[in-house]
Curated annotation (Swiss-Prot):
Protein name: Membrane lipoprotein TpN32
Similarity comment: family membership: Belongs to the NlpA lipoprotein family.
InterPro entries tied to this protein: Lipoprotein_NlpA (IPR004872)
Residues covalently joined to lipid (N-palmitoyl cysteine): C24
Predominant localisation class: membrane
Alphabetized PANTHER family for the sequence: D-METHIONINE-BINDING LIPOPROTEIN METQ, METHIONINE-BINDING LIPOPROTEIN METQ
Pfam families noted in UniProt: Lipoprotein_9
Gene Ontology CC: one annotated term: plasma membrane
Originating organism: Treponema pallidum (strain Nichols)
Amino acid sequence: MKGKTVSAALVGKLIALSVGVVACTQVKDETVGVGVLSEPHARLLEIAKEEVKKQHIELRIVEFTNYVALNEAVMRGDILMNFFQHVPHMQQFNQEHNGDLVSVGNVHVEPLALYSRTYRHVSDFPAGAVIAIPNDSSNEARALRLLEAAGFIRMRAGSGLFATVEDVQQNVRNVVLQEVESALLPRVFDQVDGAVINGNYAIMAGLSARRDGLAVEPDASAYANVLVVKRGNEADARVQAVLRALCGGRVRTYLKERYKGGEVAPAL
């Protein structure tokens, strides 16, 4: 009887020990923060979140309303990475704010376009028409090049990726260029004759570059939206896992099915 009791106790200890070993081998999910602005970035990260969860990475998606705050959060280490901008915009931030941000890879492109509630064709705009454009220099330069391609203006030779209205050499159509914060462009859209709107804000306003744009950026490849980190974190396994998920099959399929008009397309 005593022997049976000892044996039972021993078995109990062995079971407890085995349970403890199993518990110790369970991998705890690691939380990592990534900052975004809005559509489509937040939705793409939700898809990526499901993918990296399989690798025990818990993605904490933090939405911001300001470009600069997003980059400053990465610089401070509040979040590990952000996903909202293209390389020229990132370079502009680094230059103006003594930043040290780098891109770890292209994800998608969002063509810039000229929209109007009043006119249906570029040729319809009269002299004196007011056209709103983004006021941050990287996107302002994109807008100016688009307006140049559409015949509204001519830019000074060599004006580059950070051109401003000061680089307009000739106002061919005598339009008024009104600089507006990118996030506010959809709001002022009804108050001006036309507006050159960033892809993500156009989407939020229910606009499609291919369907509604009077002039559409022909090649947005230089402005692919990228995943950004502070220099030194490029090889972080969590960053690379998120990048793979954002460039993976599920995200590419979503983009093709959700944005059939090409408003957002996977980067090549």
